Structures are given as structure tokens and as C-alpha cells.
Swiss-Prot record:
Molecular function GO terms recorded: membrane insertase activity
Organism: Nitrobacter hamburgensis (strain DSM 10229 / NCIMB 13809 / X14)
Residues that span the membrane, as ranges: 9-29, 375-395, 449-469, 507-527, 546-566
Protein name: Membrane protein insertase YidC
Name of the gene encoding the protein in the UniProt record: yidC
Membrane topology qualifier: Multi-pass membrane protein
A biological process term (GO) from this entry: protein insertion into membrane
Main location: membrane
Gene3D superfamilies: 2.70.98.90
Binding partners and assembly: Interacts with the Sec translocase complex via SecD. Specifically interacts with transmembrane segments of nascent integral membrane proteins during membrane integration.
Task of the protein: Required for the insertion and/or proper folding and/or complex formation of integral membrane proteins into the membrane. Involved in integration of membrane proteins that insert both dependently and independently of the Sec translocase complex, as well as at least some lipoproteins. Aids folding of multispanning membrane proteins.
Superkingdom: Bacteria
InterPro entries referenced in this protein's UniProt entry, alphabetically: Membr_insert_YidC (IPR019998), Membr_insert_YidC_N (IPR028053), YidC/ALB3/OXA1/COX18 (IPR001708), YidC/Oxa/ALB_C (IPR028055), YidC_ALB_C (IPR047196), YidC_periplasmic_sf (IPR038221)
Entry GO terms, CC: plasma membrane
A Pfam family matched in the record: YidC_periplas
């Protein structure tokens, strides 16, 4: 009876895990989509109908003018960007930051592969850039620089972490514009714009900043990850607009103080970080010219009236780079990973990394893995060590759980007697059983608690592996070169001995891409199942026989780091449960149960005549 209850509970928990995963990846996205549509409709209704003045709009080069990235860079005068993590240039035409490579990150695990391209100039296939400046008040005739204005560099030399650059433009009508750009040793640009009025009358200008991206980017397509426009906008808090969502809304505006906004990918982002005291008219928008869509995050600050002989100025910042947790920052109690979030006094800038709804578990999971990575120098080993710690933390609960189940085994004679007394009265039987459990201080469902508590651990580790750049291209040993990617080996081509890729087979490909680690995980799960006697109920037996096979196929496409965790967790569970069983005087039947499987298979073979 005890083993039947335990097996039933485990089956329920595993089935619940599958249902939770289904809810997490399929049902919730639809609910979120409906909620987002309502939110967009509400936001549009309360947004100002017309910013004053109009926000800058993206330029749309003719389709025939599209050129290669290198050609576009070479045909405009530029100031070089050269820092330990960034390489690129500032276009003097428009004074845009539109050429940026992340030199510490490569497109593939091959260190000789190209560096990640973040920004690309207008005229290429996928322009992506940041622009800053001034907008004249409605009705004003003041001529301000735009995307076609050619600026001049004061002095010479590249923009480095120790040498800012200053650009200048004189409109010939009494207004002189200067822009000083500095960059730190990570991904933060600081931009100071000044305008001096030597004309004959005061002039009113609005400071602006924008990030513009042409073309709809390829996204991962997973609900657990946001890719698109993002911002933490004062009292309106975190705002996330996928490309599809902003296509439907067209434009949404927000009046905010102490906000930031930008565009985020899975691992990279560009974000505008205005002064925390600035009053902003922030906006997300989607525009279309021909077949090309343009996505833009921008803001206008309050107007500045510059008197004759006076100077107006504004400061802003641009984050453009990798979403490294230590650089962006982590807002979590008792943790000193402040990054830009703390350094600049920003409002929840750590949410640029999509920690998810269960951030209170995901963040500690990442911090633990990151700590042990710095101890061992390998994220795979860090995963193994953190799993051991989790097992140690849950050990008292697991011990009490199995002790309770041992008591259940001790009262089985009483339960059997009750079944004989009440063969047809199920309600009375349950009442009497509960009385026995209460008297003996037995919790009949305690056996599933350790497994239930593992579910949030599983999902938090999956989230960390999937969204954090620290896990990207992080190797383990042997053939695992990237813990955030699925195991690259395939059993159906004999792990590379046969010259074809099973995952490329039409329709069946995703089901044939089963690597070595998913198989190891399935074997460890099978041993864990065999730690308990075979259930007498045929349905339970069928579920438990097929569960390791099902999970092997399910986890084959998951990150290798997660599969390694599950396999290691199964192994530790077998060791831990065997220890607890012996400690409670229960015989460990693992080897006998395994042998019985093969004995049954042998006995099923037809006898030789």
C-alpha cells in the first residue's frame, strides 16, 4: 500500500509538472496576449494625441540604395570607437552612433567567428542606431541639425574610454550646436548636447533621443523571453511591447519622470537613460515604408528657451551592449551587484534582463551559479555543485517525508483490516484511515513534497540558462561547448558516425535529435523509478515504464545544462533515498527491482523446442 501511494503521488506530481509546463509555455501566452491587447488599447486612449512638437521620425532610404554594411560605413565621414569591449564608429552625418560591434562576443562558439553586430548604419539591410539632438518648437523657424546634417569633429582621434570626442555644427543663423560623447569601459555612452544662441532672438528647443531599428528582427519566439521594445516608465512601471504588439498599437506615449526605454534582444540591448529628474514624453512606435517596418523608442524632454547670448544643455546616456548581470545590475536584497542600476540611480534597470515572474527564485539561482563559476571556473561544475546544495537544503524535508512513509508501511496491517471491515463503504473506510494517520502522525502526501519543491528549481534554472548571457557559449566538458544550447550529439546517427543530421529529417527531425545527455538523464530517471517496487496496478506500471522515455524525448531539445542538472539530480536522489531508506530500516530493493525487469524479459522469450 505504501509503495502504491508513493507511486501514485509521484505519477501525479510528474503529470502536474507536464501540465505546468504546458500552462507556462502555451496557455499563459494566450492570456498574456489578450491582456496586452487590452493594455495597449487602454494606453492608447489615455496617451496624448499629438506630442508637441512632433517626435523625430526614422529615415527610410530607397530600397535600391541598400548597400553592404562595409560600403555604408566607408561612404560617410566617421569618428572611430575603440574600447576594450566595443568597436565601431560615429557617423558625422547626423552625428549618430550607428556602427557598433561587441568584440567580446562571437556569433558562434568558434572564437574566430565574427563579432556580434549591434548597430548598423542607415542604407544597410538592417539599420539600427541611436540619435540625439534638438527639435524646434511648433511654428519655429529655427534650423536645427537633422539626420542629413554633417557635423565637424573638434580636434581629432578616436572615442576611447579615456578620450571623449566633441562634434560641432553651426547653422549659420546664430545657433551653434556641440555634442560631447564619452564612453566607459563597458557599454555606457554619455552624451552632452549644448546649443549657444548668438542670434537676434530667444529660441525654444526640445531635447530628444531615439533608438531606431529597421526591419522586423528574428526573435526566439518563446513566451518566457521578451524581445522588442522595453522601458521602465515611472509610475507606469515596466512596459514591454513585442514587435507584433507595437505593430498593432502603432504608437503609445507615456508622460514619465525617472524612466528609461529602449529595444532588447535575448542577449543584447540598446536603451536610453535620461537624467532621472527629467520630465519625459516617452514613446514606442512602429512605422512602415513600403515593405520595411521601423521600430522606435524615443523621448522628448521639456522645452528649453535659450536667450540671446545664452547656452542650453542636456545630458543623456545610452546603454548599447550585452546584458551582463554584473554590468546591468541585479536589484536583490543583500546582494552587491549594483552595476549601472545602482551606479546611475536608475529605476529598475535590472529588468532589462528578463528574470521572469519567478525572479525571486531566478535571481538567487543565477547568483549561486555565478558565485561557484568564479570558484570553479566552469558553469557546468557550478550547476552540479548548486544541485548538491539544493539537495542538502531539502534533505531534512526528504528525511521526514520518507520517515512518514515508513510509518505508513508499519500501519498497513491495520489498513488491510479496515478494508475487510468496510469492503463496500468507501467513505467510512477513508474516515477510519484518516483516524489512523492522525493517531500515528502520518502525512499521506508528504512523499511528494520534495519533488514539488524541485519544480520551481527546475524552471528557475531553465530561465537562467535560457536568458542570461553568462551561460551563452559556456562550455562543460567533452562535446558540450554551450550549456545554453541542446546537446549537439544524436543517437540516430550513432553520435556522428553516420554522415547525416537526424534533426534535419522533415517532420520527425525534432524527435530524432536525442543526444547523449538526454539518454543519460533517461537512464538515471529509470533507475530512480526502480528504487521502488513495481506498482501492482497495470496503469501505474505503464506510466512509470514510459515516463523516462517520454522525458528523454521532452528534454532532448532543452539546454544541455538543464539536462545535466536533471541527470545529476536523479543520481543524487537515488543515493539520498537509498540512504534514508536504510536509516529508517527499509531494505533497498533497487538492484533486485532492476534484475527482475531483465528476468521478466528473459522469461517472456519463447522456449526452444
Amino acid at each position: 500500500m505504501m509503495s502504491e501511494n508513493r507511486n501514485t503521488i509521484i505519477a501525479i506530481v510528474l503529470s502536474g509538472l507536464i501540465l505546468i509546463a504546458w500552462q507556462y509555455f502555451y496557455n499563459i501566452p494566450q492570456m498574456e496576449k489578450d491582456r496586452a491587447a487590452q493594455q495597449a488599447q487602454s494606453q492608447t486612449a489615455k496617451s496624448p494625441t499629438e506630442p508637441t512638437p512632433n517626435s523625430p521620425k526614422p529615415d527610410h532610404p530607397a530600397a535600391e540604395s541598400v548597400v553592404a554594411r562595409g560600403v555604408a560605413i566607408a561612404t560617410t565621414p566617421r569618428v572611430k570607437i575603440d574600447t576594450p569591449r566595443l568597436s565601431g564608429s560615429i557617423s558625422l552625418k547626423g552625428a549618430r552612433i550607428d556602427d557598433l560591434l561587441l568584440t567580446k562576443f562571437r556569433e558562434t562558439v568558434d572564437p574566430a567567428s565574427p563579432a556580434i553586430e549591434l548597430f548598423s548604419p542607415s542604407g544597410t539591410t538592417t539599420p539600427y542606431y541611436a540619435e540625439f539632438g534638438w527639435v524646434a518648437a511648433t511654428g519655429s523657424t529655427a534650423r536645427v541639425p537633422d539626420q542629413n546634417t554633417v557635423w565637424q569633429q573638434e580636434g581629432s582621434g578616436a572615442l576611447t574610454q579615456s578620450t571623449p570626442v566633441t562634434l560641432k555644427y553651426d547653422n549659420g543663423e546664430g545657433l551653434t550646436f556641440r555634442r560631447t560623447i564619452a564612453v566607459d569601459d563597458h557599454y555606457l555612452f554619455t552624451i552632452k548636447d549644448e546649443v549657444t544662441n548668438a542670434g537676434g532672438a530667444p529660441v525654444t528647443l526640445y531635447p530628444f533621443a531615439l533608438i531606431s531599428r529597421h526591419g522586423t528582427p528574428a526573435v526566439s519566439g518563446y513566451y518566457i523571453l521578451h524581445e522588442g521594445l522595453i522601458g521602465y516608465l515611472g509610475d507606469q512601471k515596466l512596459q514591454e511591447y513585442s514587435y507584433k504588439k507595437i505593430d498593432e498599437a502603432k504608437s503609445v506615449s507615456f508622460k514619465v519622470t525617472n524612466g528609461w526605454l529602449g529595444i532588447t534582444d535575448k542577449y543584447w540591448a540598446a536603451a536610453l537613460l535620461p537624467d532621472t529628474s527629467a520630465q519625459l514624453q516617452a514613446r514606442f512606435s512602429s512605422n512602415e515604408s513600403g515593405s520595411v517596418k521601423t521600430y522606435q523608442a524615443d523621448y522628448l524632454e521639456d522645452a528649453q528657451t535659450i536667450p540671446v547670448g545664452g547656452t542650453g544643455s542636456v545630458n543623456t546616456r545610452l546603454f548599447a551592449g550585452a546584458k551582463e548581470a554584473g554590468v546591468v545590475g541585479i536589484n536583490f536584497p543583500f546582494v552587491e551587484l549594483g552595476g549601472y542600476n545602482k551606479q546611475l540611480g536608475l529605476n529598475h534597470f535590472d529588468l532589462l534582463i528578463d528574470w521572469g515572474w519567478f525572479y525571486f527564485i531566478t535571481k538567487p539561482m543565477f547568483l549561486a551559479l555565478d558565485f561557484f563559476f568564479h570558484v570553479f571556473g566552469n558553469f557546468g561544475i557550478a550547476i552540479l555543485f548548486v544541485t548538491v546544495l539544493i539537495k542538502a537544503i531539502f534533505f531534512p524535508l526528504a528525511n521526514r517525508s520518507y520517515a512518514s512513509m515508513a510509518k505508513m508501511k508499519a500501519v498497513q496491517p491495520q489498513i488491510a483490516a479496515l478494508k475487510e471491515r468496510f469492503p463496500d463503504d468507501k467513505m467510512k473506510l477513508q474516515q477510519e484511515m484518516m483516524e489512523i494517520y492522525k493517531k500515528e502522525k502520518i502525512n499521506p502526501i508528504s512523499g511528494c513534497l520534495p519533488m514539488v519543491l524541485q519544480i520551481p528549481v527546475f524552471f528557475s534554472l531553465y530561465k537562467v540558462l535560457f536568458v542570461t548571457i553568462e551561460m551563452r557559449h559556456a562550455p562543460f566538458f567533452a562535446w558540450i561547448k554551450d550549456l545554453s544550447a541542446p546537446d549537439p550529439t544524436h543517437i540516430f546517427n550513432l553520435f556522428g558516425l553516420l554522415p547525416y543530421d537526424p534533426s534535419a529529417v522533415p517532420l520527425l527531425g525534432p524527435y530524432l535529435a536525442i543526444g547523449a545527455w538526454p539518454i543519460i538523464m533517461g537512464i538515471t530517471m529509470w533507475f530512480q523509478m526502480k528504487l521502488n517496487p513495481t506498482p501492482p496496478d497495470p496503469t501505474q506500471k505503464l506510466i512509470f515504464d514510459w515516463m523516462p522515455v517520454i522525458f528523454t524525448f521532452m528534454l532532448a531539445a532543452f539546454p544541455a545544462g538543464l539536462v545535466i542538472y536533471w541527470a545529476w539530480n536523479n543520481t543524487l536522489s537515488v543515493i539520498q533515498q537509498s540512504y534514508i531508506m536504510r536509516r529508517n530500516g527499509v531494505k533497498v530493493e533497487l538492484l533486485n527491482n532492476v534484475k527482475s525487469v531483465f528476468r521478466r524479459k528473459s522469461s517472456d522469450k519463447p522456449a526452444k523446442t
